[in-house]
Amino acid sequence: MEALQNMVFALCEAAGTSGAESPAAAAAAGFLESAAQVEIDPMGNVVGRLGKIGAPNRILLNAHLDQISMMVTEIDADGFLRIAPCGGIDRRVLPGSPVTVLGRERLTGIVCGAVYGADKLPPLEEMAVDLGMTKEQAELLVSPGDRVVYSGRPQRLLGSRVTSPSLDDRAGCAAVIRAAQLLAGEDLSWEVIVLLSSREETGGPGAGTAAYVLDPAQAICVDVSFAVQPGLQKGKYASLGGGPMVGIAPALSSGMRADLTRIAKQEGIPYQLEVMGGSTGTDTDHICIARGGVACAMLSLPQRNMHTPAEIVDLQDLEWTARLMAAYVRGLV
């Protein structure tokens, strides 16, 4: 579990916002290259090949690289950085929060904004990042388009739980890489393609274009989903440490789901179900419609505090997810 934690922490500490994933891609490629032939495609996706490379049947193991962030839109006359969302930022946690501006160098700032009272939040366009600089000083280090991310470092909690910004979806990337490591060197019937995709938080073009080029027959997509916490009741949401959430949705293959749950029972891997009546809101929605269609399954990692600076996952869920994917791939003929 220590090696898995080290990988998760290293991935979370690498910047990788939508459309600017290069540092995170380099970190992920470094962990993957011992198990697969790795390249980074024109969209910034990390692609790793293993198993029976060149086989007519290919399975994609997917998670997304990018983290939610904000983008500098202008530097106002008083030196404040005006910002816009780059993905689904949770503005409830922003006022008074420290953030990191990825300018010509990494800068620490504080989000400030209009004060409406405890029962109302200012819209994001009324918030700004305070660097403690004048306009002239800020312009030497920051430009419109620079990204702003939550400050914070990964930390171990009790047991096998960890907290960090960007666990959505670096935790999923770690689970997919771990699955590749488990499969490395094995005599497999299918080609296995790891796809750590770009720009999921801003529409999913990374996964969509890669799935078209790679042309898999099947795909297993790993992302995070909501875990039980105050305000989210048991039964509708998953439990941390309860195993991966196997997805049920119109876009997903019922046959693959049945095989995954059967294999989980055989392997003694706990799992939970996640029922979605419409789209999944993940890269699965883009992969499943590539070319003539791709049979897709979805495994979600239970997570608390999604899209905040203190997301929480259980490393045991990541390990079980990796082992379930590896067992599924071994069974393909």
Q: Where does each model-flagged region fall?
A:
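N-terminal hydrophobic/helix-forming segments and targeting peptides
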Residues: 1-333
